[in-house]
Regions:
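Carboxylate- and glycine-rich phosphate/diphosphate-binding segment that chelates Mg2+/Mn2+
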Residues: 1-74
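Short, amphipathic C-terminal "tail helix"
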Residues: 178-234
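Gly/Pro-rich interdomain helix-loop hinge
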Residues: 92-179, 218-221
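Glycine-rich phosphate/pyrophosphate-binding beta-alpha loops
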Residues: 65-98, 192-198
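Amphipathic alpha-helical interaction segments
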Residues: 28-32, 36, 55, 59-62, ...
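Buried hydrophobic packing segments
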Residues: 13-14, 34-40, 64-68, 82, ...
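Flexible, glycine/charged-enriched surface loops at secondary-structure junctions
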Residues: 21-29, 45-59, 74-79, 116-117, ...
């Protein structure tokens, strides 16, 4: 529960930061929440009964509220749209579904879109630069925008591994045939989700289908620690 809900907080904050409805006010809140999650979520997860762990849990409660203030004003994006449908269909905890999607959605949103999302104060596509800003704020390598995006994706994946989270839908014990039979319907529903309009990249339904395909299983052979997590969640 600590890992699932903590990664939901992270997704709230990151999506709010790159939203087309983001402002100077929400950016400050979102960035602070992101930094707090990376600092305190592992401590909260590992040391619940220690003094450090109890302080970390308090900090995570604060981070959750701060991220909530950010996304209540800036709203969310397709990460949540996809997670809503994925979790509902296959009974995957909400934060876990968000976490599995997050690295893939960051990569997707950081790519120059074929269709731009529009909002009066969102004059140009800046999602890739804002992901790189997050990487810099976390002390990650970000000498270029591309390096910053890559560093952030890697940091999210490393955090998930540290929390013993499944990295794929397959690792959650979902049968491949059942999953692939549902994803086109889920993608269409995700496109119509209330969170989609604030996403920095206006998605095509086919692109959402592809994200669902990409998260089913690892592109490379599953490592030992990932195999162990998959067995625990089967």
């Amino acid at each position: 529960v600590t890992a699932d809900t903590g990664l939901d907080v992270l997704t709230h904050a990151i999506e709010a930061y790159v939203s087309i409805m983001a402002t100077d006010y929400t950016d400050a809140l979102a960035m602070k929440a992101i930094q707090m999650v990376f600092e305190y979520l592992p401590k909260s997860y590992k040391g619940a009964n220690t003094a450090e762990g109890k302080e970390a849990r308090e900090k995570m409660h604060n981070a959750s509220c701060i991220a909530g203030m950010a996304f209540a004003n800036a709203f969310l994006g397709v990460n949540h749209s996809l997670a809503h449908k994925l979790g509902s269909e296959f009974h995957i905890p909400h934060g876990r579904a968000n976490a599995i999607l997050l690295p893939h959605v960051i990569e997707y949103n950081a790519t120059m879109p074929s269709k731009f999302a529009a909002f009066p104060k969102y004059k140009s596509f800046v999602a890739d630069k804002k992901y790189a800003e997050i990487a810099k704020a976390l002390g990650l390598k970000a000498n270029t925008t591309e390096e910053g995006v890559k560093s952030l994706v890697e940091a999210v994946r490393n955090l998930m591994k540290e929390l013993n989270m499944p990295m794929t839908v397959q690792a959650c014990g979902i049968e491949e045939e059942t999953y692939f039979a549902a994803i086109e319907r889920l993608a269409l529903d995700a496109f119509d989700d209330q969170c989609t309009p604030a996403n920095p990249r206006l998605p095509l339904v086919s692109e959402l289908v592809q994200i669902y395909k990409d998260i089913y299983k690892a592109k490379s052979p599953i490592k030992k620690e990932e195999k162990k997590i998959a067995e625990q969640n089967a």
